[in-house]
């Protein structure tokens, strides 16, 4: 690890396309002539300009364009009315760039025009109200017409720049462009120009998060080098990877119509001639219950594990028995990657997720249960865990229907203590929900995604609600870091084949995960306070990190025998658990912790979460098969 000293208090970064490194805070990469008022948020070099033209955005809401060879500011744009958070450029358009600011606008700049004003490309306030803030943006490296935008809330937006421009051009050229009736409404964006992505469990959790003053905001978005994946660091939550090629809707509850229970078809094992309806995962949950699939599909027999994977599964089972939930999850994930058609592995991993109970774990457990059922519709434990997951995710009516379905499929379990306990929980929740709706009156209805505000400042338009309901779900989730203190925290792809994911954290560390297994492989201390920025070198195995400390650290591989001067965090699981507690802590406690105060339960070890949800499962145990 090398260290570059910087004399200011916060550093942002830019790694140029050719691979040279440059860092700045008030542009220490250049002379003081381009120093700015306020905290510098972002800078980018204009492509194909010989590293001569530098674009800067700052908290003073201004966007400046500097010529480094003549040491002059050649353009200054003051169109934004709030802090500029990010600048984006595209190699295909060497004279064009974009900015995202906290006024909710995405602006486009064309340096070939003489105008000193920019064009509003996307106005998020037309969709989400006046309080929305744009936080980050990036252009797809393989398709420069594709722009990703992160803003307030859990949704990440992809826009087709070319479609937007063509739509506005056709509107201007239309003979009736200036003639509108009273009922006309001009859409700011054409149909098909926007696509939303969201972690499927987050929309329904928003009311609870808001009540606890927990803010969700996309602090960084970036595409993979191939342009087929989108990585999002979700402030207040986890890091998510979205597959842009094989898209999937948020998982819904869809169950086979019939499944004959017998001693041979339980807990992930079934006879080789078993045939039943399959399970689909392509649609949203609806508040009026779940829909059963109409088509029939062939179910493959249970795949036997090779000896080495059987050993991995046994190690995972042992970790589960010792209540080492994270270790069990990582071992099951390792096995799932090698044997993706084994229902038992998904069912076991779901049980570990349900026991650990970190943010998003019950939704991942739901996904695993559905996958297990799709591979084996007669997987007893997966059916029961599915009902429990739906209950924990606040889909109470669906949980009741799922539990009834479970009792019908497995009548010998219908009166077990586990079923009775879950049934009582669901009944109590339904009564509580009905009482709450009666108190709120007839105007308080609506599904979990269609959340409408009574305030005009943060009202959500009909177009926005449609786009949200058409959103796609994530492929992978990465846990362990904490992202609650700053709104510029990055996550990035790393490795020769982008096989790793890296992210900064509020505890001064940065985390490295395997992309495909989502397993945490290394935690390194990168700052005394917070790691915000992580940028990989485009052609060498270098990683640049920065945060609050007045230094930029450059990381590259070292011999195993070489001392890393205490930078390696040995207790990765303990650090991850502490960060999960920090994310769920009271905001005042987090502020005091960041100021140096010691808060009991936040800065010390221990799993922190009770495991009483499955204590009364009776015959339907949540232990792995």
Predicted regions and their residues:
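WD40-repeat beta-propellers
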Residues: 32, 57, 63-68, 87, ...
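Terminal intrinsically disordered, low-complexity extensions flanking WD-repeat/beta-propeller proteins
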Residues: 2-18, 154, 164-230, 235-240, ...
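Conserved beta-strand element within WD40/beta-propeller blades
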Residues: 20, 54-58, 97-101, 147-151, ...
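Short coil/turn segments within WD40 beta-propeller repeats
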Residues: 41, 59-64, 82, 103-107, ...
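Loop/turn segments within WD40 beta-propeller blades
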Residues: 44-51, 88-95, 138-144, 222-227, ...
